Amino acid sequence: MNCFLFTLFFVAAPLATASYGSSSGGGGGGSSYLSSASSNGLDELVQAAAGGAQQAGGTITPANAEIPVSPAEVARLNQVQAQLQALNSNPVYRNLKNSDAIAESLAESSLASKIRQGNINIVAPNVIDQGVYRSLLVPSGQNNHQVIATQPLPPIIVNQPALPPTQIGGGPAAVVKAAPVIYKIKPSVIYQQEVINKVPTPLSLNPVYVKVYKPGKKIDAPLVPGVQQNYQAPSYGGSSYSAPAASYEPAPAPSYSAAPAQSYNAAPAPSYSAAPAASYGAAPSASYDAAPAASYGAESSYGSPQSSSSYGSAPPASGY
């Protein structure tokens, strides 16, 4: 093995000396490790590849090695810099950059990527305002998240079990005060920031479909029945318009159909058919039939003692 390595070194040493030359042949500066023949061949290849536009290898310096920038490229770069400065000085862009919109989009992206692996909680806040729709994703565990919808976009369609659907739209901002509703949601399918879940409600076999849409779509917000009185308060803009619809429909229906029916059909019937029949049919017949018959019969009885005592009985008895 050692003999083979020695033979290989003995053959390769003259070839290396012939190709690269000795250290004294390259000059004291050591600027080139190639011989004159190899250097000339390399320059020819470079000139052929560059079309004669490339300088010789010995004349290239760091100063002339950079490619000069064209005037069109300089103008385009200046325009881009001007646009960037104008964008940074725009107050709308600064407000958007400093607002929660970026955090909201990141939260929705995180929701779209992680919701399939675990459960989330959708929390309806205590106050739902008719402003800009905002949703915030709060991680509550390794695979658990909370989506808090704070401000749905108008119009709001609120469906309650005991009330018809009420729409809050137009006018000033309407505030709906309700107790927080927390739903435990299983992994679901999301399409364009849209969550459709089938949530079983406590103490009920009927599921509730909760839809979380992106801004600009209708939101179905199921509220607990206990907030019905607070929602119909006339102090709020949207509730004051929907409360008369519930107050005018049940109240006049019993007042105009039940009460007049009893006042004009039941009460006059006993007053005009029962009382006059008893006053004109029973009392006059008893006063004109019984009383005169008794009075004339009594007079005949009064006359009978007279006829029996004085005219009929006494004289014949005394005469015979």
Swiss-Prot record:
InterPro entries: Chorion_S36/S28 (IPR008449). The tetrapeptide (A-A-P-[AV]) repeats found throughout the protein are also present in many proteins constituting the protective envelope of other species. It comes from Ceratitis capitata. Sequence repeats lie at residues 178-181, 258-261, 266-269, 274-277, 290. The keyword Cytoplasm does not apply. Keywords: Repeat, Secreted, Signal. Belongs to the chorion protein S36 family. It comes from the Eukaryota. Residues 1-18 form the signal peptide. Chorion membrane (egg shell) protein; plays a role in protecting the egg from the environment. This is Chorion protein S36. It is found in: Secreted. Transmembrane segments: none annotated. One of its GO terms (cellular component) is extracellular region. Residues 259-320 are annotated as: Disordered. Its main location: secreted.
